[in-house]
């Protein structure tokens, strides 16, 4: 196959490209320039997408003897990932920028350009696997290295995107093996630390970064009964389930800590309550996709596992496509309550190791009806915020 290897400058993508070459494919390397000002992105142990990363990727491509290019997607990244991140927080939601990047940049804009140029697939260093299903169609599966599995952040891929994706690290049992292989191949970034957190927030201070862009407007912190018990410096910086950073002047009657239950951008308030009030018995959303062949009857309840964070444990659940308040939604009912679920998060559903699909969470139903106020539909929240 003619393969476009996306090379971030890290060890995983370098080894993935090396394996593609070793497998006999016609490989070309590409590094994505995602920032208008690369110097503002993280460098060193916490970084990705910097000028240094571009040079690391070029050196790896030279070692492999493959052509190498840098593609500028900075404008698209700013609009589809960075601006979207800000807008979601302003609407009281909690986005996942890595998933948005996969959905709109790496496996959309980049893949589209690759196919236009005659490539058959895009190769990345993600820990996931593409296997042939019983119907002969490609399926997205978890990686063999469960601790490194990245199928969650790839849950936004469609059947067409999966068919043109190549993940050479999917069957690798551990990251240590990848590093050892890189060392043996003479790849300079063999011991380069993994990147973490959000690449476009230089110091990891999400609250400060957001304040610089949307302002820090003081507001009230409310308890479940609507009583003002504290103040904040900007509701946009909070997320459901958060405990740190709450300036609460009135202690809880039982002396226990309180957590963010809801963000209300319309009146710039944050609602807090006890930890048990975070328990959720149902999640749903209208923005859902299937990763390959959907369930035979998605309108009938089917068994699955649901995962709501990249490194969370999957939870057994039942799911079905239903009409709720006039909109078609994927509704998921976990066997045991989920905790700290925020509008804007992504729920990925699995059948064993296979990714079935994903949904952006718009609505939640509390498992403790009297412990927290009802969470409004995120579409209404966004409308109230002027989105």
From Swiss-Prot:
Its EC number is 2.8.1.13. GO terms for molecular function: ATP binding; tRNA binding; tRNA-uridine 2-sulfurtransferase activity. The record marks 126, 345 as: Interaction with tRNA. Keywords: ATP-binding, Cytoplasm, Disulfide bond, Nucleotide-binding, RNA-binding, Transferase, tRNA processing, tRNA-binding. Disulfide bonds join 101-199. ATP binds at residues 6-13, 32, 125. It is found in: Cytoplasm. It is an enzyme of class 2 (transferase). InterPro entries: MnmA-like, MnmA-like_C, MnmA-like_central, MnmA-like_central_sf, Rossmann-like_a/b/a_fold. Its main location: cytoplasm. GO terms for biological process: tRNA wobble position uridine thiolation. The active site is at residues 101, 199. Pfam families: tRNA_Me_trans, tRNA_Me_trans_C, tRNA_Me_trans_M. One of its GO terms (cellular component) is cytoplasm. Residues 148-150 are annotated as: Interaction with tRNA. It catalyses: S-sulfanyl-L-cysteinyl-[protein] + uridine(34) in tRNA + AH2 + ATP = 2-thiouridine(34) in tRNA + L-cysteinyl-[protein] + A + AMP + diphosphate + H(+). NCBIfam families: PRK00143.1 (NF001138), trmU (TIGR00420). Belongs to the MnmA/TRMU family. HAMAP family: tRNA_thiouridyl_MnmA. Catalyzes the 2-thiolation of uridine at the wobble position (U34) of tRNA, leading to the formation of s(2)U34. This is tRNA-specific 2-thiouridylase MnmA. The gene is mnmA.
């Amino acid at each position: 196959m003619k393969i476009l290897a996306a090379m971030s400058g890290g060890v995983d993508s370098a080894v993935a490209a090396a394996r593609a070459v070793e497998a006999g494919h016609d490989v070309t390397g590409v590094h994505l320039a995602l920032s208008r000002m690369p110097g503002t992105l993280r460098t060193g142990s916490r970084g990705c997408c910097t000028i240094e990363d571009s040079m690391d990727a070029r050196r790896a491509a030279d070692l492999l003897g493959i052509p190498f290019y840098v593609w500028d997607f900075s404008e698209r990244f700013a609009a589809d990932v960075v601006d979207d991140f800000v807008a979601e927080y302003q609407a009281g939601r909690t986005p996942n920028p890595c998933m948005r990047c996969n959905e709109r940049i790496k496996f959309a804009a980049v893949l589209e350009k690759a196919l236009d140029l005659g490539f058959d697939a895009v190769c990345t260093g993600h820990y996931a696997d593409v296997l042939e299903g019983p119907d002969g169609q490609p399926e997205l599966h978890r990686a063999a290295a469960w601790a490194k599995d990245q199928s969650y952040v790839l849950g936004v891929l469609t059947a067409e995107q999966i068919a043109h994706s190549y993940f050479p690290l999917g069957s690798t049992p551990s990251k240590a093996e990848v590093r050892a292989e890189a060392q043996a191949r003479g790849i300079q970034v063999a011991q380069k630390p993994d990147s973490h957190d959000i690449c476009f927030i230089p110091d990891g201070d999400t609250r400060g970064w957001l304040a610089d862009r949307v302002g820090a407007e003081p507001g009230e912190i409310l308890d479940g009964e609507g009583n003002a018990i504290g103040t904040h410096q900007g509701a946009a910086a909070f997320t459901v389930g958060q405990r740190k950073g709450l300036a609460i002047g009135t202690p809880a009657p039982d002396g226990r800590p309180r957590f963010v239950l809801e963000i209300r951008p319309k009146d710039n308030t944050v609602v807090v309550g006890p930890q048990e009030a975070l328990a959720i018995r149902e999640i749903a959303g209208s923005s859902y996709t299937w990763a390959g062949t959907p369930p035979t009857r998605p309108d009938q309840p089917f068994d699955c596992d649901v995962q709501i964070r990249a490194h969370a444990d999957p939870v057994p659940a039942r799911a079905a496509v239903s009409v709720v308040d006039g909109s078609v939604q994927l509704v998921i009912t976990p066997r045991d309550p989920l905790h700290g679920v925020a509008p804007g998060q992504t729920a990925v559903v699995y059948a064993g190791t296979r990714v079935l699909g994903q949904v952006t969470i718009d609505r939640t139903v509390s498992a403790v009806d009297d412990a927290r106020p009802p969470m409004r539909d995120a579409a209404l929240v966004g409308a109230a915020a002027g989105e």
